[in-house]
Amino acid sequence: MSAKPASTHGTSVRPNVASRLSPTTPTLEDLIAQVKEGEVKIPAFQRPFVWKDEQALQLLDSLASNYPVGSLLLWKTSEKLRTERNIGDFTLPDTDDHSPTDYVLDGQQRLTVIYSCLGAPEDESGFAAGYDLETENFIAMSDDLPLTVFPLRALFNTSRLLDYRTALQSRPNKEDLQKRLDSLVRILSGYRLPVVTLKNLKLDEVCPIFERINSSGTRLSIYDLMVAATWSRDFDLNARTKTLAGHL
């Protein structure tokens, strides 16, 4: 008796997504540079940043321990979506409408922490963290912290990092502090975050992928995607739906 073929009822032929996946492993510094240039954007359907300070500090500790922290999923497309230019509290530059954009499908919370703690200017608002070289713990930055707390936003600022190294020379245990700083800088500078980019996929091909993504229990629906994809200066599907619902 021959086996019955698997049912395809209610499904359509799916695209060969695997052939259009592009895995890369950029350094944290390279990823931050992409964010600063506006090449990576947050779609409007994504939730706002919701992580608590402890979650952010735990991520930093995982990075410094060289632990895997999961991958980012991006969708590279020339389709214009409604985007939130802000990543956390940071307003990022616009890019021209013709350049492909990498939209964050999964990993927004992690990317926001990485940018806020390691890439943002030191005088910017938003969550900032430091590394206590005495206790070897990550802490939230605040006023009047001791010199031994290294501000992580100085990590990829060469002149600022050199100034901090020089300041450490005034400490009696400067050798130990310097070794711990060097170790931290080496690990975070060399850390590579897996990034999977979906390329050459149309809107209807991306929809099933959106449906499968689940971030902290919040599933992205086809409606969420359609709101983002159909938005323009003259049309907002979400606003139009609410208006119509109000007349029913």
Question: Which role does the model predict for each range below?
Answer:
Residues S2-L248:
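Basic- and aromatic-enriched surface patches that contact anionic nucleotides/nucleic acids
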